[in-house]
């Protein structure tokens, strides 16, 4: 008797819907990559922005450096209520309160003020919760976006560095 060779013929695997979607997504990603390659290599269009000469436009919702606002009379809006310090998830805000004396009464609308107000940008995650928590609208994240430095002390913002001269947005409005 002779031996019989048995050959198994495998049926073709049918792709499920998620496998089809996966291949579609891969194809779409490759198409986007090809478009960018054609723009950069063949058409010689610039991909990057030359930073110091050209600055990009930021969205109106962009969260930049922290700024502190003054009211219309030029007084500090911050009344040292500690709301921003308590709500900060990164614990990046430090406030030291002091009583307002008669000599500086014209600078502060309430009976206490922030003697020391510091934000550690090395810890800050720019979540904007301090801006939302402030009942007086004293702190906003609408400053410049460039904050590179070679000195760690420059990344600790003091009240004097954050304070703007006069005005600022009305509570709840962005510039």
Curated annotation (Swiss-Prot):
Question: Is the keyword NAD assigned to this protein?
Answer: yes
* Sequence ranges assigned to domain 4Fe-4S ferredoxin-type in this UniProt record: 69-98, 115-144
Q: Which GO terms describe its molecular function?
A: 4 iron, 4 sulfur cluster binding; iron ion binding; NADH:ubiquinone reductase (non-electrogenic) activity; quinone binding
- Which Gene3D superfamilies does this entry report, sorted A to Z? 3.30.70.3270
Tell me the residue numbers annotated for binding [4Fe-4S] cluster 1: 78, 81, 84, 134
Cofactor list: [4Fe-4S] cluster
Which InterPro entries does the UniProt record give?
4Fe4S_Fe-S-bd, 4Fe4S_Fe_S_CS, NADH_quinone_OxRdtase_chainI
Keyword rRNA processing part of the UniProt annotation: no
Q: How does it sit in the membrane?
A: Peripheral membrane protein
GO BP annotations listed:
aerobic respiration
The note on cofactor binding and number reads: Binds 2 [4Fe-4S] clusters per subunit.
Q: Which UniProt keywords apply?
A: 4Fe-4S, Cell inner membrane, Cell membrane, Iron, Iron-sulfur, Membrane, Metal-binding, NAD, Quinone, Repeat, Translocase, Ubiquinone
First-listed, main subcellular location of the protein, grouped into a coarse class: membrane
Q: Which GO terms describe its cellular component?
A: plasma membrane
Q: Which domain of life is it from?
A: Bacteria
Q: What class of enzyme is it?
A: translocase
Which residues are recorded as binding [4Fe-4S] cluster 2? 88, 124, 127, 130
**Which reactions are catalysed by this chain?**
a quinone + NADH + 5 H(+)(in) = a quinol + NAD(+) + 4 H(+)(out)
The listed locations are: Cell inner membrane
List the PROSITE patterns hit by this protein, alphabetically: 4FE4S_FER_1, 4FE4S_FER_2
User: What family is this?
Assistant: Belongs to the complex I 23 kDa subunit family.
Relate the protein's function as given in its record: NDH-1 shuttles electrons from NADH, via FMN and iron-sulfur (Fe-S) centers, to quinones in the respiratory chain. The immediate electron acceptor for the enzyme in this species is believed to be ubiquinone. Couples the redox reaction to proton translocation (for every two electrons transferred, four hydrogen ions are translocated across the cytoplasmic membrane), and thus conserves the redox energy in a proton gradient.
Subunit structure of this chain's protein: NDH-1 is composed of 14 different subunits. Subunits NuoA, H, J, K, L, M, N constitute the membrane sector of the complex.
Name this protein carries in UniProt: NADH-quinone oxidoreductase subunit I
